[in-house]
From Swiss-Prot:
Protein name from the UniProt record: Straight fiber protein pb4
The encoding gene: D17
One Gene Ontology term, aspect cellular component: virus tail
Quaternary assembly: Homotrimer. Interacts with baseplate hub protein pb3. Interacts with receptor-binding protein pb5.
Primary residence: virion
Length: 688
């Protein structure tokens, strides 16, 4: 039987899980002899125990757990009297209530693909889309170029885990992809990583350019023109719908004699570029000569994909061709001493399509709008070209830019004239490097700059990070998520705070001072996001527990204790026999009182110490011991005694019924005054 006051019951405040680590926050201990904590984890029917000998924190991190697995946990404090066998039997401790938690699921990739950013003109940059499942505070995605098995894994994304993650900056090629998840535990130091999961399929990163749609519904109209000398003009027109393809840049009509087409194909064909118009007119088309026709849609894009041809059409002008002179009168040209003007007939109204002024050289191009404004105009006096729309070109000097990768092979950039990336000249350079598919930035000069090479951002001057809590310099940095404590003083247990603020109203970050014995200090914990200075989204403050101890009443002063026994000697002149009065006088003179039980005194003759007498005080009289040994004694056999009282004794074997602490053994009532008693006869230990 072991009698011992068990430590107070542990309270499990919260359990925060990772993939293989669980962070358990628990209550404080109130027993000063606590030396450790134990936790029992139950997985199905299997129970394991984890021991922690440190007591300097109120949390533990349990490792070697299984992702996505559900566990049941109980915890308890234990003191020095509790050994491993008692812990296994859960004897002499107060177990916490059970709490169930589930480990996080590691991130997995369910799909990987490449799409292009939508653009009106040219080729959009390729964007990688990664579909994921699982849980993480943040994740890391790495790609490996599949062209060579020795290529390294390259980190392309570190950030929040979302169902679909998008990122760019990946060069064209075939890639393997892998993902790992990370969870930050509230201690602010430990990060639980899931390890890498590699997607089994290789995916392609490429320019997902969709060629323009082909022209359709090609129609031929012939007109007979009696303008001095008879001729035939041919109008070719078509339809075009963008559909899912690229925007058209211009249309080109190609036509060739069928006989020549047989010999050389389209090599010697004649071409008419009509821009965005969807018709072309051929003046003086030959009579009874068969021709092949096609119309090409041309867009800004890669050279091999930017042209789409219509189906080839065959046409011959002969007696059976119906004539339609309607298109002849749709347009007109005015040429005089003042200007050259083009016009088109809209119903009964002629509308201007272009005008060249003879006096100034001013030019207006395009159909006028309701206010008379042309899409393009040139002012020769101010030397300004005005464009009401967009200009598509490969090089332009301007104050404002919209960078476009027109063919998929360009390196669009904005830069100060003469400035190149990374040089010492003052100015700016910002653009894309198509060799590495990474954006680059250079602002400043040789010594003062912000420079990004696609992987590393370098800033020569001081950097300050703005947060809701004020600016933080880069040397200090932003602290990660952490466990924080809040305190409040009161006479009864308060309700758990509902505000995520740190600290909530009425609470403090440090323990307050008590001004009365009736007051207690109460505590709660939570996981803080230092960026917002509030609890991490989705979490709350733990249940409130009492942090301060219970104030006890003052104790009564104890009685003066008895002097402990000792061994003494006394020189007496002309000593011939033991003298009680001399012995009693020795203790009265030196200690102010008579001898105490077990005091030992040796009286010897002055000048002849060989004459000596030793007695022990038994509490009422001086008695002669059976043997007196002046010095050390080594006994190989057995020493049998009804009582042994000693300051130090070294015994390899001892056979006794009861062992008391020394003060109790010296008292007149050891059973009533002992602090510790070992009863070897009945088999129990008792500590008061």
């Amino acid at each position: 039987m072991i009698s011992n006051n068990a430590p107070a019951k542990m309270v499990l405040n919260s359990v925060l899980t990772g993939y293989t680590l669980a962070y358990i926050q628990h209550s404080i201990y109130s027993d000063y002899d606590v030396i450790g904590r134990s936790f029992w984890l139950k997985e199905g029917s299997n129970v394991t125990r984890r021991d922690f000998t440190g007591i300097d924190t109120f949390s533990v991190t349990i490792n070697n757990l299984k992702p996505t697995t559900t566990y049941e946990v109980q915890g308890a404090f234990y003191d020095s009297i509790i050994d491993s066998e008692l812990l296994n039997a859960q004897i002499g401790i107060n177990l916490s209530d059970k709490q169930t938690f589930k480990m996080k699921s590691a991130p997995r990739i369910t799909g990987a693909r490449c799409e292009s950013e939508p653009v009106d003109v040219g080729v959009g940059a390729p964007i990688v889309y990664i579909d994921t499942t699982g849980e993480a505070d943040y994740c890391t995605i790495e790609l490996k170029d599949n062209s060579n098995a020795n290529n390294p894994w390259v980190k392309y994304y570190v950030g929040a885990l979302m169902p679909t993650i998008m990122f760019g900056g990946v060069p064209i090629g075939s890639y393997k992809v892998r993902i790992s998840g990370q969870i930050s535990l509230p201690d602010g130091v430990t990060i639980d990583s899931s390890g890498y999961y590699e997607y089994p399929n290789v995916f392609e990163v490429r320019y997902n350019f969709v060629p323009p749609a082909a022209p359709i519904n090609i129609v031929f109209k012939a007109a007979r023109i009696a303008d001095g000398k008879e001729r035939y003009d041919l109008r070719v027109q078509w339809d075009w719908n963008r559909g899912a393809g690229a925007n058209v840049r211009e249309f080109v009509l190609s036509y060739i004699d069928s006989a020549e087409f047989v010999r050389t194909g389209w090599t010697k064909a004649q071409k008419i570029n009509v821009g965005a118009a969807q018709s072309a007119t051929i003046i003086s088309f030959p009579w009874k000569v068969e021709h092949k026709f096609k119309v090409s849609s041309i867009a800004w894009g890669p050279d091999a994909q930017d042209v789409t041809d219509s189906a080839v059409q065959t046409f011959i002008l002969n007696e059976s061709t119906p004539l339609d002179n309607s298109f002849v009168n749709e347009t007109g040209i005015e040429v005089n001493y003042a200007y050259i003007k083009g016009k088109i007939k809209d119903g009964s109204t002629w509308k201007q399509t272009f005008l060249i002024d003879a006096a100034t050289g001013a030019i207006n191009i395009g159909l006028l709008d309701a206010e008379g404004k042309a899409p393009i105009s040139f002012d020769p006096v101010k030397k300004i070209v005005n464009v009401d729309g967009s200009v598509i070109t490969k090089t332009i000097n301007a104050a404002n830019f919209v960078m476009t990768n027109l063919t998929g092979q360009d390196n669009p950039a904005i830069y100060t004239q003469g400035k190149t990336w990374g040089d010492t000249k003052s100015g700016i350079w910002m653009g894309m490097d198509n060799v590495t598919a990474k954006p680059k930035l250079d602002i400043g000069n040789a010594t003062q700059y912000i420079r990004y090479d696609g992987n590393i951002l370098r800033i020569s001057s001081e950097v300050v990070i703005g947060t809701p809590n004020g600016d933080i310099d880069i040397q200090t940095g932003i602290q990660g998520k952490q466990t924080v404590f809040i305190y409040i003083i009161g006479t009864s247990l308060p309700a758990k705070p509902t505000s995520p603020a740190y600290p909530p109203s009425g609470w403090s970050k440090t323990p307050p001072n008590r001004t009365s014995n009736t007051q207690n200090i109460y505590c709660s914990t939570g996981t803080l996001d230092p960026v917002t200075n509030q609890l991490v989204s989705g979490t709350s403050w733990s249940d409130v527990v009492q942090w301060s101890g219970t104030e006890g009443v003052d104790g009564r002063p104890g009685a003066t204790g008895q002097r402990g026994p000792g061994m003494y000697s006394l020189a007496i002149a002309n000593l011939t026999a033991w003298n009680d009065s001399q012995a009693n006088s020795f203790f009265t003179s030196n200690f102010g009182s008579g001898p105490v039980k077990y005091d030992v005194l040796t009286e010897y003759k002055s000048g002849a110490p060989g004459t000596a007498f030793t007695r022990q005080w038994n509490g009422s009289a001086w008695t002669s011991p059976a043997m007196v040994l002046h010095g050390d004694m080594i006994v190989n056999g057995t020493v049998t005694a009804s009582k042994i009282v000693a300051n130090n004794a070294f015994l390899s074997q001892i056979g006794v019924n009861i062992i008391y602490d020394r003060a109790a053994a010296l008292s007149s009532n050891p059973e009533g005054s002992y602090k510790m008693k070992i009863d070897l006869q009945n088999g129990y230990i008792h500590i008061r």
